Amino acid sequence: MAELHKAGVEIILVSSGAVASGRSEIHPAKKLDSVDQRQLFSAVGQAKLINRYYELFREHGIPVGQVLTMKENFATRRHYLNQKNCMTVMLENGVIPIVNENDTISVSELMFTDNDELSGLIASMMDAQVLIILSNIDGIYNGSPADPASEVIRKIEHGKDLSSYIQTSKSSFGRGGMLTKTNIARKVADEGITVIIANGKRDNILVDLLHQELPSLFPDVQSSALDSQLTYTHFIPAPQPVSSVKKWIAHSEGFAKGELHIDDCATKVLASDKAVSILPIGITDVRGEFEKDDIVRIIDFEGNPIGVGKANCSSEQAREAMGKHGKKPVVHYDYLYIE
């Protein structure tokens, strides 16, 4: 990372490890429940972790800053933009933001699945060119990574079904696994961001990836590696990046206050390449209570969730307009994300 920073690459590091660091530092006097353990270990471990990063980067003359966040901070546009502004100012002043979930006060029901989910949100929020997810294996395999016959899938195009390949095993101390990594990678790539899953245990992996595989994006990155055959999985980004607002909405499903159920015709139109809004005429049911600007899920005529959007009116107004012609959109196209 120091080499990339010196080459002019702006870096945001999303790092876990606070709980594990704290666990090795302190031994509770009595048995604690899971919530108390997480809060205690993360409080102690985060101080140890950020201090270690501070010392390591100081050896290279690089300042770092700590950013602790929670899932709720992505729920409203105001908090979302406030976080973005904080990290933008840090990057503009040569500071590497080191981001982690604030486990000391996060509510279990609203915690990130793991830091892969958090990294996807950060990459999307900051309009990153590349999201690199480092794991303990070389990428997405076409079988079990433990099977010698399995090979890494090097490129993943849009719409490719990977469900039969993904293993459910988790990394040590982590809350999520390869399924989470794949889901996040696909969503972020659909937003126009290059996503790479690679082995973080490989020496110089970051420099080699950017120098050998993405030279057009990072021409100033130099690598001394002789082996050009890197093994990793590359998620091909959508050719047209989505707007900043749509990126926020795309990751807001967990904060949805209600549901809009739409008919067969509306479902088909939304699945096309047309820029269309959700009109009352195509709505068959409005569930939940929400206000204007709240996030709502979009449910197709078969009951499948197909997207999320920002409501242009309250649930009461949506019910009054439901099924009628000539009414304003309940969700405008500019604030609609279809998966």
Map each language-model feature to its residues:
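C-terminal catalytic "cap/lid" subdomain
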Residues: 1-30, 35-63, 67-339
